Amino acid sequence: TLRVADKTVSGEGFSVSFDPKSGFIRSYRLRNVELLAGPLRPSFYRAATDNDLGVRQTGKYPDSRMWAGAEPELVNFTLTSGDGGAKAVADYTIPAVGAQLRLAYVIAADGSIRIGETMTADSARKDVADLMRFGMAFETPGMFDAVEYYGRGPMENYADRSGAAFVGRYAQRVADQFHMKYVSPQESGTRSGLRWWRLTDASGFGIEFCSDRHFSASAIPYAIPQLDNGSSEYVRHPGDLVPDGRTHVNIESVQSGLGCVNSWGRLPRPEYLLPYGDYSFNFLLQPVTGGR
């Protein structure tokens, strides 16, 4: 039986709480353990790669950094309960890019959450940059440091750089997801072609994601601002990075390709770009109880 009170849904061994100001899920407790160390929120930007910086420096295209500051503003939030579970709907505007966003949640009695993210673009806006990704992001406590998935691997891979990454089942550590051999910090650690992806602690306790289509995900010890402070001159070596004690997770339906043609202005091929437009992503978040 689900209980709904004060923007919190609780059931047998779990609770989900929504932030009253943002409408985002701010707490997900499973068997008295908090799984979130930051809200589950929309994600449109990635830390700039060397190729991204090369494109930016040409000045030929709208600056993708506008998506780093594309903060959704809550317009309306509803939370109801019924036979099919508890349902929450949050509607937003995104003033920086002129878009509308809806986040819809269905919380079941087993603690699983079906999440739908839908963005509607303003077709009159011609000044909006391509997206870098379309999905959601959150943080967990650092004890959630084991990744297991069925998808492309074992190395990081992207839409236009995945030919040598074969589909299989892989078990890895969060500490090993980030590629430390790039000269400067940048986007790293994504795995694509995912059928399912889970993040757990050493006992196998945590969360799992799946979707009705292939998706991408990453879990690294660093936040995007640690890798990219918005400046093209921001150069620091990966060895200088200090983990902040949390695991930083991105899960997305799509992410822009890397390009890898050159690093002084060439965009990725058109089929790997994410032009401003309408996007949607539907996925399931479910608990993994492991040995607990």
Map each language-model feature to its residues.
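Beta-strand/loop-rich accessory regions of lumenal/periplasmic or secreted enzymes
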Residues: T1-R292
